[in-house]
Amino acid sequence: MKKYGAPQISSGDLLRDAVARGTELGLRAKAAMDAGELVSDELVLALIRERLSRPDALRGFILDGFPRNIAQAEALSDMLGRLGQPIDAVVLMNVDSAALLKRLTGRRTCSRCGRLFNVYTSPPTADTPCVDGRLEHQLVQRPDDNEDTIRNRLDVYAAQTRPLVEHYRGRGLLRTVEAEGDIEDVFARLERAVTPPAVRRSRKPRR
């Protein structure tokens, strides 16, 4: 996240990179990812631990998609405690299941420039040429962005990830953001949720 000078660390991206590179961890994770199941805590924690040790994460970071269950949350707290970097906030991006299904099944990535599109809500147009100047993007869909796999992921979320809501709410860390609507509106809600009130007041223009 350039605005905050902190790297966005996505557990999903770390896993997919490990799979693409054919590492030992990646090969062990591939079967579970293809089926829409949660990868074992051991594998995810190993990747996260390695990523947090890099210099750009020493002053702060944003974890995306992690933790996903209570065991991971407790292991993360232990890890960050040893690093002297306690959790500042936990954000729940709240989206209706039907809207989420449409968002994920419609997700496409241009294999040329890496830009993300959605065939339902934000398809490419002539005003969004590819990085090489072509008007056509080479759109590809992730193998796990199909309806059956996504529904299975939602079931796994209900069973294993939803308990985290109460886990972090009880610790006073949870911030809930309504994540439907325009990207700019959602980001504004997110900023309000994670910015302390005193900081928000100091940003208001003085008359």
Task: Mark where each language-model region is.
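Glycine-rich phosphate-binding loop of ATP-dependent small-molecule kinases
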Residues: M1-R207
